[in-house]
């Protein structure tokens, strides 16, 4: 689950990190009234959307007076920002954040995330702050340091010094940076975060270490432990279809292709998407129905897939372990009759009761295309939509 910048900064502040003082609001009048409490020569106005690249899209402005802030806020609120992360449709700005300006001397990059390969927490640091870290990794990889921390260990001063070595800080600033690393680590563990990113992390001309921007993503599977974080969820920033899918306990992510996918198991879903690409088409979604598939769940999944107007065909790929293929097949047949599917539908079943499942599909009277294996299924759905 993602949250807004102003929310991320408040959590960082709670754990001891230093952030600029700021206020957020849903209306211009509210913003201006709150901004009067800020002690600053200049105001930094920021659009609050769940996407990076706001500055280049006109979503970050530096203003000299309250009057300038009011004019800029009126222009920005309700505007649709298009960045490299929003896609061509962009995101509408529905809340604004204004904070005190900072006297920047140097900009750094810092992030903390889970390294699944080593089962450790990894810190990524760079002296190239304010830039897209992927771009830095591609052009100047020597500018990036990665430091792995065992999740069972406390983070030490020595660990912190490794992380911040590339910043080349003087003594007092170095102490501040070490304290910040410990705060980020404590926050990461304490909130069950997947990622904490501070970009840029700055050294001011007054020699203060400050988190100038922040992005946090939380493990959705651990949110039951954090009701206070659940309250920060902004449904306006999420795809309505993905919200609907979550209500039916479906793991769904919309993509840009033309072949809808319904699969049980995340690994099999990824393999299904890969083989669709191998045969020259693009998947329209990732959809994992999980270990159980009632008629209602299959029907909901098909409706969600078909709500995407780009879908020209559907591939259902099921390996029956806990899930019985005959139960899934009956769910597909019942749902297909109810929805009246008009696009080609290829079904591949394997595993528990797959023979019974195939019989149900063959005797359904529906124009379903049966596949023997994943390779066969991918070829058939690609051919069917041509």
UniProtKB/Swiss-Prot annotation:
EC number: 6.2.1.5
Recorded metabolic or biological pathway in which this protein acts: Carbohydrate metabolism; tricarboxylic acid cycle; succinate from succinyl-CoA (ligase route): step 1/1
Group of enzyme by EC: ligase
Residues that coordinate or bind Mg(2+): 199, 213
A molecular-function term among this protein's GO annotations: succinate-CoA ligase (ADP-forming) activity
Domain ATP-grasp: 9-244
UniProt-listed PROSITE patterns: SUCCINYL_COA_LIG_3
Gene Ontology biological process terms in this record: succinyl-CoA metabolic process; tricarboxylic acid cycle
Subunit: Heterotetramer of two alpha and two beta subunits.
Protein's name according to its UniProt entry: Succinate--CoA ligase [ADP-forming] subunit beta
Gene name of the encoded protein: sucC
């Amino acid at each position: 689950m993602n949250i807004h910048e102003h929310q991320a900064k408040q959590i960082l502040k709670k754990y001891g990190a230093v952030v600029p003082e700021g206020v957020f609001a849903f209306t211009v009048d509210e913003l201006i009234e709150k901004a009067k409490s800020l002690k600053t020569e200049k105001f930094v106005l920021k659009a609050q959307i769940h996407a990076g690249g706001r500055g280049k899209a006109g979503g970050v402005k530096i203003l000299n007076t309250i009057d300038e802030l009011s004019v800029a806020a009126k222009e920005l609120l309700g505007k649709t920002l298009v960045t490299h992360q929003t896609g061509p449709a962009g995101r509408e700005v529905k809340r604004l954040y204004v904070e005190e300006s900072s006297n920047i001397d140097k900009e750094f990059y810092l992030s903390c995330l889970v390294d699944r390969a080593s089962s450790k927490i990894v810190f990524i640091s760079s002296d190239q702050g304010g830039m897209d870290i992927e771009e830095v990794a591609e052009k100047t990889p020597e500018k990036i340091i990665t430091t792995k921390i065992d999740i069972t260990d406390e983070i030490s001063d020595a660990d912190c010094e490794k992380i911040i070595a590339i910043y080349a800080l003087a003594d007092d600033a170095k102490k501040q940076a070490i304290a910040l690393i410990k705060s980020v680590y404590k926050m990461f563990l304490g909130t069950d975060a997947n990622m904490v990113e501070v970009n840029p992390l700055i050294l001011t001309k007054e020699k203060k270490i400050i988190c100038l921007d922040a992005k946090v993503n939380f493990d959705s599977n651990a949110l039951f432990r954090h009701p206070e974080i659940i309250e920060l969820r902004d449904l306006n920033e999420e795809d309505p279809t993905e919200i609907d899918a979550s209500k039916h306990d479906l793991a769904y992510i919309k993509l840009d292709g033309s072949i809808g996918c319904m699969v049980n198991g995340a690994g099999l879903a990824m393999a299904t998407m890969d083989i669709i690409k191998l045969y020259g088409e693009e998947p329209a979604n990732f959809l994992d129905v999980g270990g159980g598939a009632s008629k209602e769940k299959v029907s909901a999944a098909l409706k969600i897939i078909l709500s995407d107007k780009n879908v020209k065909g559907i591939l259902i790929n099921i390996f029956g372990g806990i899930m019985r293929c005959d139960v899934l097949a009956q769910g597909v047949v019942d749902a297909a009759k109810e929805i009246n599917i008009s696009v080609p539908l290829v079904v591949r079943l394997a595993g528990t009761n797959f023979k019974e499942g195939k019989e149900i599909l063959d005797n359904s009277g529906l124009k379903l295309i049966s596949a023997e294996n994943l390779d066969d299924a991918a070829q058939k759905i690609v051919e069917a939509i041509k």
